[in-house]
């Protein structure tokens, strides 16, 4: 008999820095997962992406075992890194805080392709451009 998924837990954790402290510990503790087992495995799997925020979807089964899938970093995090800023604009329509090039947007779109609901790189680029504009970034050629 196949294991039944009892709960899905979605978290965003810095790569290689998962600890049993909040928010990881309480979220997994409620689901009955071995927290240390998860943190060790997550840190080992994401050690090469240090400095990035990694979204993770943890499937908890009825016997309290788990599997997890790591996703690509959020577009906003990648855009901030490309533009070299700490945060986006509080008023994106009025105040522009940084600019990104089409080449940087294409690079981010290609990296995010597996997680985006887009059929082509051009469609993915327009999605990333929309995120950039909503953060107060200007897009230059």
Swiss-Prot record:
InterPro entries given in the database record: Ribosomal_uL11, Ribosomal_uL11_bac-typ, Ribosomal_uL11_C, Ribosomal_uL11_C_sf, Ribosomal_uL11_N, Ribosomal_uL11_N_sf
GO molecular function (one): large ribosomal subunit rRNA binding
Keyword NAD: no
Pfam families referenced in this protein's UniProt entry, alphabetically: Ribosomal_L11, Ribosomal_L11_N
GO biological process: translation
GO cellular component: cytosolic large ribosomal subunit
PTMs per UniProt: One or more lysine residues are methylated.
Alphabetically ordered keywords of this record: Methylation, Ribonucleoprotein, Ribosomal protein, RNA-binding, rRNA-binding
HAMAP family, A to Z: Ribosomal_uL11
Primary role: Forms part of the ribosomal stalk which helps the ribosome interact with GTP-bound translation factors.
Subunit structure: Part of the ribosomal stalk of the 50S ribosomal subunit. Interacts with L10 and the large rRNA to form the base of the stalk. L10 forms an elongated spine to which L12 dimers bind in a sequential fashion forming a multimeric L10(L12)X complex.
Family, per entry: Belongs to the universal ribosomal protein uL11 family.
Name of the protein: Large ribosomal subunit protein uL11
Organism this protein belongs to: Lactococcus lactis subsp. lactis (strain IL1403) (Streptococcus lactis)
Upper lineage: Bacteria, Bacillati, Bacillota, Bacilli, Lactobacillales
Gene designation: rplK
